[in-house]
Amino acid sequence: MIMALLTNDLFLSCLVSGISAQVIKYGVQTVKTRKLKLTPVHLLKKIFLETGGMPSSHSSTVTALSTSIALTEGIGTNFIIALAFALITIRDSFGVRYMSGVQAEYLNALSEKLKKEIKIDTTKIKVVKGHKKKEVLTGIIIGIFSAYIVCYL
């Protein structure tokens, strides 16, 4: 079963695209914050669990899936299904994630108020207000390139 996955162009396109986007995201954040931390636990956490930022790994992964289906099977039913889910995922990276970021801000404000009024110890929620267009576009480009590299090399 593992060998079947490791020889499947669709799976490999998604894997290469997702990991590439996350590694690039780590590089971008390192340059922005000027903090380089190379411990294995930190790297694994950043590469596999970090959300938000440049580029969008969700956009890159769903684009890689759609593109690799188009390249291996043509523009048929499977491609249309993958494309529909890709468009939903990409759309939600703007809208739904924006609203969850707004809600996180309200919850953080409420948390601070409760902390002051009744001395409850709380933890701030990470606020990510969706992706910017350039983050999603960069993710899409990474997805297309990843699919081409996996399917044609």
Residue map of PLM features:
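Interfacial loop-to-helix junctions that mark the boundaries of transmembrane helices
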Residues: 2-8, 73-74
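N-terminal signal-anchor transmembrane alpha helix
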Residues: 6-29
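Membrane-embedded catalytic cores of phosphoryl/pyrophosphoryl-handling enzymes
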Residues: 19, 23, 42-153
